[in-house]
Amino acid sequence: MRPYERWHTLWQFFIALDEEWADEWPTEAAAMDDLVRGYATESLETAVREWHEAFDKATDSEVEQIVADFNPSYEPEETFGGARQWAEWVREHLEAELQRRKTG
């Protein structure tokens, strides 16, 4: 099973939270608000859980393979400094949105 099939909910966020957000939104906060508000809290929780399954114990090579499978057309080195940095950026935004929802 390919990574995008194994961690399907997380994959959806890698498609949405890419390096091109700045082309469509004036700020990162505006992009995140627009991109994640349509997702149910349960989807965010699933994506965070899948993130940890995918990346917590992954080597740099494995992270690169997972990220490349999630979104092969993007080059995370240009915007994020590498695949692991993009993965961390996605996780940080998922967790921040969950926290925002929990605190109201």
Residue ranges and their predicted role:
Residues 1-35, 91, 95-97, 101:
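Short terminal alpha-helical segments
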